[in-house]
Amino acid sequence: MIRQDQLRYLSQQSKVSVLIIGAGINGIAAFRDLALQNVDVLMVDKGDFCSGTSSASSHMIHGGIRYLENGELRLVREAVQERNRLLQLAPHYVKPLPTMIPIFNWQSGIWKIAAKFFGLSGLLLSPTGLRLAQSKGEGHQRGGVIVKLGLMLYELWNSPSIVTAARMPSHRFQLKVSSLKQFPELSSDIVATAIYYDAVVLSPERLAVELVTETEKMSQNATAINYLSVVGMADSQRTVILHDEVSGQQFQIQPELVINATGPWIDLTNRKLGQPTDFIGGSKGSHLVLDHPKL
């Protein structure tokens, strides 16, 4: 439906079962799930679809391998399976990504990782009962034994019975000579390298927009409109006021349920809705983009 037609319909039909505020990947996922269950749903965003946090990601679709150290097996399993589903369902956007781990020794981190895995990181005792001493930098290294065990465990859920068409290649180890021959820029201090596969999404915003347009085609009860921001609540406290950033027109919507999917703006949105919260802390993630042809 053309945007002007959507706005015209919105001015005539103010009631909707679910209003989703925020069209990042979480808002879009909720939008799609509700629409496929034949729920009438309206999703709005103050800017372009997927223009916030969802577009400013590392573009990785990874299985959460680092969570193995904490023993979060259920989380890793879910992440690997969802990664494989994306590889199968969106191969035009999601591709396998070979990832190389340089290994500088074979034994570092065995007891530390084992203690962390079993929730005993406060003890860190060796079998002899002596507290383990760490050499300089050892706390940040994972030896070859740990990397091998971790990758084997990681691939337990990469079974063809889960997503046959999207099974990833198995990991492999290369010793020092072969590694330096293939990657001569690596430090000569390595003893080996490990190569495993995760996935990368080349254009997360395109994948998101495709999900929106396909959902609207599949369900007549699903409407998604961008450049429509939340102003506040009407006096009735059951009516949400929306503002068209293009024309300046305002709309009053009466949803039975509101889903706030505005990510880091969630507290600001809740304040406008008359429900002040303080969910967002002061953490921030940063990504470095390097222009390096060899990478």
Regions found by a protein language model. Give the residues of each.
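Central beta-strand plus flanking loop segment that forms part of the substrate or channel wall
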Residues: 277-295
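Dinucleotide-binding Rossmann-like beta1-alpha1 core, especially the glycine-rich loop
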Residues: 59-178
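Short hydrophobic core segments
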Residues: 20-21, 253-263
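Flavin (primarily FAD) binding-site architecture
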Residues: 260-275
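Extreme N-terminal leader/targeting segments of oxidoreductases
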Residues: 1-18, 33-37
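Glycine-rich FAD pyrophosphate-binding loop
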Residues: 35-55
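A conserved short coil-to-beta-strand element within the FAD-binding core of flavoproteins
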Residues: 225-239
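Core beta-strand elements of the Rossmann-like FAD/NAD(P) dinucleotide-binding domain
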Residues: 14-16, 247-257
